[in-house]
């Protein structure tokens, strides 16, 4: 499949299409064997850790506080992530005010992660990271562009929080470059982008060789099925929008209570079934 899209380019839309086909083939294999995907891949664990992810810069204070309080209080998820890097790094003061608010809401014990979506310059990211550490931030995602491998490595060498990137890796080669550059403390991967389940497993194996953990980007219910079979998985992103869509249209969605997703060994294949009638009103083609 990768050779077939060489002339139009492997990254972007082509990669997501390849990833979808690969994932579907794994689903077919599990169906033919009559077993859950998690069992087919081999279970290293019965459940996978998740972190609540949302906290968009467009949220007002009350909205941010309510979302964080629900994750930590209602769902008992012990780790959460918010967005920073508003206006492409042009509003550091509000970024830091929101981090301070988040820490106040979740209390001293929950882990606090931030994602700048590549908004900062290298020196700026180092400066911001020093302030983040004051609030106990332990995860700094894409402090600079994920294409700036030298910049990521420079930030990583100078800051206390773990530096993470990789959600835009479209191939095994992309992940290999991040690892070789010493750009990350934790490699992010996305089954829907990196070549499907096959690509995710291959990149995870590369990370094992570099003594790195991996973290799954979005699509939490899909990644949970894969994640139980990945020995170096650190956690899965329980992303606000994705989990909402999964609940709207699918049966078999897992509950994140206690900060863990637990694939049901009694549910075969990918574990979810599309409710086609619920999705039909949103059809556009």
Label for each model-derived stretch:
Residues 130, 136, 147-260:
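Shared catalytic-loop signature of beta/alpha-barrel
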Residues 1-112, 117-119, 126, 130-134, ...:
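N-terminal capping/lid subdomain adjacent to the active-site entrance of alpha/beta enzymes
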Residues 50-54, 78-82, 110-116, 140-141, ...:
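Hydrophobic faces of well-ordered beta-strands that scaffold small-molecule active sites
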Residues 37-40, 139-143, 217:
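Flexible, glycine/charged-enriched surface loops at secondary-structure junctions
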Residues 55-58, 119, 145, 168-169, ...:
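Short, surface-exposed acidic/glycine-rich loop or hinge patches that mediate macromolecular interfaces
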Residues 120-121, 223:
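Short, active-site-adjacent cap segments at secondary-structure transitions
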Residues 87-89, 121, 147-148, 196:
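Conserved protein kinase catalytic core
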